């Protein structure tokens, strides 16, 4: 399910659920190489559709008599993430979230030098998606699709921390551990997002993603509580990644429990 390419200083986690077993996604340290630029485009496009679909469900629900409903909004977020993981996860890793990228880098599973470029691509995708929605729903139909705390700042911070911790813990489990059932990675990750939106949506808007909050905030010029959505998800994701590293413990070498090729390739080789 994940490509885990070893390097001298850091490794890159790439979600891979395709049937192409002849090629393995290789790490590229060059910031101007074609493969790396392809990854950036995949991250920008993936983040665009994640934010467009998720935030569109909020705006449409607000403008059209709650036809989507709150559970429907949660399902939209979960489904779009699931689809995107299977679509471009094997190209860029399917982060779509600066918190995920930073967390992987903190555990040396993603090249630190590539983090700024990934974050910029993710923010660009979010801003473009938010701008598209504002153009589509101008005038009386214009709705702020960002995230604002509905309780205290402390309550919102703790919720965002816990939800992002949970999301990152699941991502690490299905994307970096060779013992996981890789074909269900997208479903597991999307389902986790869906659950978090249902639980935390009424309290914080269930961001779990600095890009998800910053894009709409930038387009609408509304920054209430934005620091919560920039800080809490990053701290939560880093904590989730490190805790999974602790519970991953096995008597096998790390190289045998982290994925070195696609799940399907490893499975075929074992037959």
From Swiss-Prot:
Motif (NPA 2): 209-211
Domain of life: Eukaryota
Annotated GO MF terms: channel activity
GO terms for cellular component: peribacteroid membrane
UniProtKB keywords: Membrane, Nodulation, Phosphoprotein, Repeat, Transmembrane, Transmembrane helix, Transport
InterPro entries: Aquaporin-like, Aquaporin_transptr, MIP, MIP_CS
Residue positions where Phosphoserine is found in the record: 262
Compartments in which it is found: Symbiosome, Peribacteroid membrane
One GO term (biological process): nodulation
UniProt topology in membrane: Multi-pass membrane protein
Domain comment quoted from the record: Aquaporins contain two tandem repeats each containing three membrane-spanning domains and a pore-forming loop with the signature motif Asn-Pro-Ala (NPA).
Protein name from the UniProt record: Nodulin-26
